[in-house]
Each structure stands twice: as C-alpha cells, then as structure tokens.
Amino acid sequence: MMGLGNFIKGLFGKGEPSMSTSEPVTEAINTNLYKVNSLAFEQEVVKAETPVVVDCFAKWCAPCKKMAPVFEEVAAEYENQVKFVKIDLDQSKDIAKQYHVVGIPTLLLFDSGEVKEKLVGNTTKDKLKASIEEVFKIKSE
C-alpha cells in the first residue's frame, strides 16, 4: 500500500512511479534491463523468448543496493542474448511465494519459463557470469 507521502509525491509528479497497481507495469531502466511488477512478470519473464535473469530485491535492502551495479554491468554484457529484469518483492510478494524466495537479493535464472538456477545473497560479477554461461550455454559479447 502506498503511503500518504508517496501518494502526494506521485500526484504532483515528484515521486517514482508506483509498481503496485492493478495493471502490468514494465519500466525500461536501460536497453537490456527492466523493472516489472508482478502482473507483468509472466509476460516479461515466464513467456520470454530469450533466457531471463531476475533480480529479486527490496529498496531497503543494503546487499541489494550493493548488487545493483553488478547486475547492470552484466546486463550490458549479454545484450541480445539474455534479458535482465528487476522485481521489488515488497510490492510483489506473490512472486516471492511462487518462486520460494526467502532471502534477498536472490537471482533467478529462467529459461523456457522455468527457473534453472537460483543464486541467493550477494553474487559477484564473475559468479553471475559463470552461472549465466553454464545454465544458458552462452558467452558474453
């Protein structure tokens, strides 16, 4: 639920858009990184034609904030091969429950609509790249 302060900021265009809505929301962060809400998750992740890496995070989570630049760097290296998606679990508790995410940050590697690997906790760039290359059988560009 949106707090009064966030509501007022959103009303006057001073806050970031709320991802908790009754409509699917996909927000492009850059050319290969997107933030989605739970209503857009199936279309953007489960039904995606390419492999997808999902960053399950929360805004208040310090390790998630530390992981964010690593996730963005790796997303740039696999453009046109792997799609990268972020989902705020505070606003998408149904996704956390469905995919058994109990700690954050958690990275989910999806291929053909199924989770092929789950990385829990802060993941280094090298470990993330190794997992992507092993699970999806690809190399960075």
Task: Give the predicted meaning of each segment.
Residues 1-53, 59-62, 69-81, 93-94, ...:
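Proteins that catalyze or organize thiol-disulfide redox chemistry
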Residues 89:
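Hydrophobic anchor residue in the Rossmann-like NAD(P) cofactor-binding loop of oxidoreductases
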Residues 98-102:
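A short glycine-leucine-enriched loop at secondary-structure breakpoints
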Residues 108:
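Conserved catalytic/dimer-interface elements of ABC ATPase nucleotide-binding domains
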